[in-house]
Amino acid sequence: MSDAIKHECGIAMIRLRKPLEYYIGKYGTSLYGINKLQLLMEKQHNRGQDGAGMACVKFDMPPGTRYINRLRSNAASPIKDLFNNINQQFENISRQNPKRIMDVQWMKYHAEFTGELFLGHLRYGTFGKNDIRNLHPVMRVNNWKTKNLVLAGNFNLTNVDELFEKLVAYGQYPIETSDTVTILEKIGHFLDDENEALYARFKGEGYQKSEITDHIIEHLDLLAILENSSKYWDGGFAIAGMLGHGDAFVMRDPAGIRPAFYYEDEEVVVAASERPVIQTTFNLKTEDVKEIEPGHALIIKKSG
């Protein structure tokens, strides 16, 4: 059985499956994704007494522009503080030029958290100081979009020391021994391997360097990366992640210790730690929301 809900962190993920213009036409807002993420997080506020954070990936941004945004808060009311800061930006834009808030291209280039993929986390600290550096999402940054990794989770691994030693055996030199850093670097290691193998393959096939990234995006085997990364993990976990180019995942431990649920339709793919949270946010029936089976992963490709 899992721990009581009050002793667990919470996750929330939203992937928009339509162009942002679609949500303006149907719902009258360019902020549909982040508004829904806020609801998902507020409805899990019991899981986030010690901190909250969220990140967003913008699709198809040109080189030289920021395509991942992240904000975290360890304030007394972290969810409120988090979204007050984010929404203040949108209020300022609306006040200065109301038309811009409905201009998708302008918003993507000039406003943060205006993308297609969102990940939120609520921290209930079981150990470790309530330092903002301990808050999720955590990031592994790289100039290659397909090597960027954003991670958030609800987990408690029991063999962190063993996993840390495996990282050292790979030749890495981690600066922390926490399970968060260990998981981030473990997935990152196999993500790097997959990227490098695909790069060598497509370079050998004669593709130009500038073309190879698109082929890596198309052929990246996220399932294999997760299988290799989690092979020796022992304990409970529900982990959500985003890659810089737009792939995303939610994976769950084989024993089903940590919960995770999802819903999908033609507009969105949504995941969260609690079924009723998804139901009430999207006005769904109980049977509409599916459980991510123990030992399985929900994988969302950038292609949809």
Q: Each PLM stretch: what is its role?
A:
Residues 1-304:
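Conserved short alpha-helical segments that host acidic/polar catalytic motifs at enzyme active sites
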